[in-house]
Regions:
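Anion-recognition interface
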Residues: 1-294
Length: 294
């Protein structure tokens, strides 16, 4: 492959990958693809476009820039089973960044996202959705998702980053990421507008979107309709209350996730459960001392 990425943010979905992407875009000498998430190695229909299409995403990069992309589909097993083999085949040596957050909170944000995208039906609450959409739990099973990457690329090429510590000490975590990818300069955290916030997303509606985003309409809307009125209208299309798991479902899901976290914690050298996750994450485990191949 010509000019392959030097690094890839591989997930997890709803774990601040967009924020990290934006911060890396803001650093001189780092080139990130547009779109943020090519999903080339995961999605069959995109992979079918061929390597030249993917190479073209990096064509605008300056010759001496570090090149990266950020596709959260790359850690969505079992949905996309061919991802790792494709990365190995076409990219070879690459640095991988895996962002994680409290798995129950990630699950809830994932549910909201899928609700806004109409993947989950309007009247399907989060408890019913767990059985109909097992990916809500699967994508929060971090050890299951990251194990094949550790096996394929080695722990020295996979950086664990925790959402909680990323929010708590952003400059420190940005420096850690940049050191990992081989960035030769001192990165500076930028105060940027938050993007991809699930609670602010409106549920998709084809007719509404066709009218609202028609050429010229957006400018008229912003100039003639007060912001307060626009926000009131948007709220009609947003989830009004953050969903909560029922007691029985929370207990069931916690048991599944705790089993997965026990394995993840063993590799990271910290005790991890749903109950201890936030505290442990802020100790910022930086490597994989418990990985058996070390």
């Amino acid at each position: 492959m010509l000019n392959p990425p030097h690094f890839i943010i591989i997930g997890a979905m709803k774990c601040a990958t967009s924020s990290l992407y934006q911060q890396l875009v803001a650093q001189p000498g780092i080139f990130m693809t547009t779109p943020k998430e090519p999903n080339f190695f995961s999605n069959d229909e995109i992979y079918a476009q061929g390597i030249p299409w993917y190479e073209g995403l990096f064509a605008p990069a300056p010759p001496d820039a570090l090149r990266g992309e950020a596709s959260t589909h790359y850690t969505k097993l079992p949905t996309y089973p061919e991802t790792i083999a494709r990365i190995q085949s076409h990219v070879g040596d690459v640095k991988l960044i895996y962002m994680m957050r409290h798995p129950l909170q990630r699950l809830v944000s994932h549910y909201i996202h899928e609700w806004t995208q109409r993947v989950i039906a309007t009247k399907t609450d989060i408890n019913a959705a767990l059985d109909r959409h097992p990916e809500l739990i699967d994508y929060s099973r971090y050890s299951m998702q990251i194990q094949p990457y550790l096996e394929a690329f080695g722990p020295e090429n996979v950086l664990p980053v925790f959402f909680e510590q990323f929010c708590n000490a952003p400059q420190q975590e940005l420096e850690r990421v940049c050191t990992f990818i081989g960035y030769p300069h001192a990165p500076q955290w930028q105060e940027l507008e938050r993007d991809n916030v699930s609670s602010q997303r409106m549920r998709k509606n084809k007719l509404r979107d066709a009218i609202a985003y028609a050429p010229g309409i957006s400018t008229i809307r912003k100039n003639l309709i007060p912001k307060e009125v626009r926000e009131w209208i948007k709220d009609r299309w947003r989830m009004q209350k953050r969903p909560e798991l029922g007691a029985a479902e929370r207990e069931r899901v916690t048991a599944i996730l705790d089993q997965d976290l026990a394995q993840l914690g063993a590799w990271l050298g910290v005790e991890l459960t749903c109950a201890t996750f936030k505290t442990a994450a802020c100790t910022s485990p930086t490597g994989w001392p418990g990985w058996p191949s070390l």
